[in-house]
Amino acid sequence: MKYILQLFVVLLFSFSLQAQQDSLALQQRLKEVVVSSSRIDVNFSENSRSINLISAQELKASGALTVVNALQQIAGIDIRQRGIAGTQADLYIRGGSFDQTLLLIDGIKLDDAQTGHHTLNFLPPIEVIERIEIVKGPAARILGQNAFTGAINIVTKKEFTSGGSVQLRGGSYGQIHGEVNYRTTSEKGNFLAHFSRNSADGYRYNTDFKNNNVFLKGGLYTDTKLPLDVIASFTGRKFGANGFYASPEAKDQYEETEASLFALQTKTQKGNWTFKPKIYWRRGQDHYLYLRANPEVYENWHITHKAGTALDVSLLSKLGTTGIGFDLSRVSIASNNLGDRSRKLATFFLEHRFTFWDQILDLTPGVVVNLYSDFGNFAYPGIDIGLQLSSQWRLYGNLGYTYRIPTYTDLFYSDRTTLGNPDLKPEEALNKELGLRFNSNPLRFYLAYFERQAENLIDYVKATEESLWEATNIRSVTTQGFEMEMNYPFLIGKKEQFLKLGYTYLSDDLSEVAVNFSRYSINSFQHHFTSSYTTQLTNSLQWFTGLKYAKRPTMEGYTVIDTNVQWRFNSFQLTASMNNLLNEVYSETNLVPMPGRNVLVSLQHQF
């Protein structure tokens, strides 16, 4: 397999050596972006953290059908799917767990008090996304609970032209997908809508699914000083869950989930002050059956709510930029297994960005204070440091504490294979990172070393294969890692090309973890290499190829190659995709085998 990797990389670089750059045209495509997943708006090139950006143009060029597909092309992002089309998937960053990663949509936090298994249920469709901001490393100081190892903020489109599209897609395993997108804009505001349905017979016994997705966003701009943005979304999923949970032998499991979001937010400026208030409500519903045809044997019902309000304020002064904010919310759950429970929480943030020597050096110390009605109060400080070595090179580092309180599943869940633990303590970690970034349009490159010294990590462990999985605060675990990524758009003749390479290495020191079997924490990627290449063959024909190599300490490594061809003619686009080109045999989690080579064909019409 290593020879395939070597050959693939050599081929990619051989293309790039033929490049004839047109810097002016490419720089128009790579204009500066202000990163919004922080309390203080900072240009991407001036940020002192490891942040990846995926633009709408990159998403379109990759032919990614879902956000899950796009994230799997980023080194350090471990998406563990059960099945296809992202129907059930968990998100891990830099060796953390799915409960340690926070998802946001336009800055709205979507943490789930029941379990992080449902985080990706809220993902919006590709068609409404402006960009994806991936914050690697601890972000709890900035974003609060659950951003233990990182966060992903999906920024949806705010400015667009009137129009729309319809798309039909079909392929292997009886996959059928239909969607409608509509956009309208005027001087008083704009509105976009997405409706889609995706279904399949399944790639093996009891892996069929039916998914429905609705996403609505409107902007009201009659008052230029107080523009209002409204988001409403709903995702419903019904799927066979052969071996997804419990054990690989549980072949007749079934699950239905719902994810709903409503949010209202605005942004206003008064002098050097900027205010960003928002209110939000999220709802999750989960219905699980151990035997699909016989619900009486065992079933779980869970309904969660989170309602809150937040305010981010920034002040620009002679001393730099100050960011302050708060988030007040109430979460609740009604469950036949976990019980009826609720908690109130208040989070307060404070940070200040100092700059020295004409912005050559910047320091951003900050602290987050949390007040929980059931877990007490906590304060976690941290600092980011950046040194601009030249107009292209930037050295950065950060040091800080991060945390996560247990989910209701961690605390109270009980079934024939798993036991919760009401005596669990919050997870804590001290994080260190040192990175170097090169940013010279069109080439972007960064490398980083990071270390996480975690205490009281929550994992499900057991002493023997016959024992029950029990939620436990395992002892300290030190994770060290190295990461690099390169993004290089260029031209061959007048045809646009885009090359992306990434690699992450992780090492967990488990010398103080005296457990024989671990469900989550001791199965991170050890080696993770990603590569993608997009080439414009003609003015209307484009070809994308993506490669992922992954190796976990307890499993054999595997290589997955996906490819697609996009042909545009008039107002139509025809896309043919082939996934798992090598027909690799592998699993991403829970010993659930992933599908072999499969194809999809889609036709889209723009109007």
What are these regions (language model features)?
Residues 68, 72-108:
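Extracytoplasmic beta-strand/coil segments of soluble accessory domains associated
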Residues 318-319, 323, 356-357, 451-453, ...:
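Gram-negative outer-membrane beta-barrel transporters
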Residues 200-207, 211, 221, 225-306:
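Flexible loop and strand-edge segments within Gram-negative outer membrane beta-barrel domains
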Residues 232, 266, 319, 337-454, ...:
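Structural signature of Gram-negative outer-membrane beta-barrels, strongest in the C-terminal barrel
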Residues 246-269, 394, 401-455, 462-491, ...:
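Outer-membrane beta-barrel signature, preferentially recognizing the C-terminal barrel domain
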Residues 29-60, 90:
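N-terminal periplasmic "start-of-domain" segments of outer-membrane beta-barrel proteins
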Residues 151, 156-184, 194-195, 200-207:
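Short strand-turn segments of transmembrane beta-barrel domains in outer membranes
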Residues 108-136, 155-157:
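Short acidic/polar hinge/loop motifs at secondary-structure boundaries
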